[in-house]
């Protein structure tokens, strides 16, 4: 199968309301690690904060993928609490699927634009660990990045976002019974 070159842009604007691993009443020393197609980039550590305006662009170029690989590829964003003595601890993470980003309708084709997402720690998936505001773009050969939306539209999106996110997830248990009948 032939491979196509893709480019990924992730504009990390900010993280907000982080829940430090040492407890909700303390501050964190956050940094963000972005991984894509076996490559990683990270921000600097920001000391004693739970709200950080990173305003950092991550660019991953020449990601060679077959169509099947493209459909399974993800962009992983992890927020860590830096520790001097102990191992750095994961606060929360979020993953963007290439296919989902690529399939966004016009006018934001191939882009998820300035969207707040909930950061989750896999060890405690029912608890929100903070929020992240980012724009993600996946482009193939000859693609042109979408034109940014008006600043007025963006600011209203940002102000509304945390209200919309809230804790609304519920866990469910599903019980299946499968019967097999033969020679009835």
What kind of region is each of these model predictions?
Residues 2-12, 163-184:
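PDZ domains - specifically the beta-sandwich core and the conserved carboxylate-binding loop
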Residues 4, 26-28, 71, 170:
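Residue-level preference for beta-strand/loop junctions
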Residues 13-16, 28-31, 44-54, 59-64, ...:
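C2 and C2-like phospholipid-binding beta-sandwich domains
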Residues 20-24:
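Short consensus segments that form the blades of beta-propeller domains
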Residues 35-39:
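Short strand-coil-strand connectors
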